[in-house]
């Protein structure tokens, strides 16, 4: 429906050869794909993309958990996420997915606070270490996922889990 965001690492010759397929898979023939460089650069770019995704998702999870924590305000998290989808600086596809998921179960009572990691965040953290480039948001987001796989019972983990399931069909554990 929306096409793919394709990050291609290949020789110029190979990139030109597969360009028709890239254009067919992208949202438009002009957008949604890029020959980023030689072999390996596409995977590397996607890895960094996923590290950024981890940080963005963690920000939403933390913020929404803070809103939920002030019970005396009676804030409807679902209504807030729906509001933020329209004109807010934080509007995004991740927020769209979150708002839609919250319509069905705003308390996330049936969602276990467990967030899987599929490896890209680990690779991104290692890359930051190898390059000596501080990446505290990316590495902390990964650490939080590790913590969720243990004993934490936070609402924020449920938010992360529903987002990952909504955009990629990733595992979402149910309670019990």
Region roles according to the model:
Residues 53:
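Gly/Ser/Thr-rich loops at beta-strand to alpha-helix junctions
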Residues 13-16, 20-23, 27-47, 57-64, ...:
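NAD(P)-dependent Rossmann-like dehydrogenase/reductase catalytic/cofactor-binding core
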């Amino acid at each position: 429906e929306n096409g793919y965001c394709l990050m291609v690492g290949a020789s110029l010759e190979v990139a030109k050869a597969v360009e028709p397929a890239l254009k067919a898979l992208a949202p438009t023939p002009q957008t949604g794909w890029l020959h980023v460089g030689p072999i390996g650069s596409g995977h590397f770019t996607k890895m960094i993309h996923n590290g950024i995704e981890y940080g963005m998702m963690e920000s939403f999870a933390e913020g929404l958990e803070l809103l939920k924590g002030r019970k005396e305000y009676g804030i409807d998290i679902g209504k807030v996420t729906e509001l933020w989808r329209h004109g807010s600086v934080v509007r995004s596809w991740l927020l769209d997915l979150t708002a839609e998921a919250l319509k069905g179960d705003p308390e996330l009572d049936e969602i276990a606070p467990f967030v899987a990691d599929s490896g890209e965040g680990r690779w991104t953290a290692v890359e930051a270490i190898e390059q000596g480039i501080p990446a505290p948001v990316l590495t902390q987001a990964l650490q939080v996922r590790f913590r969720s796989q243990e004993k934490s019972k936070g609402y924020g983990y449920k938010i992360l889990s529903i987002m990952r399931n909504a955009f990629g069909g990733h595992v979402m554990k149910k309670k019990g």
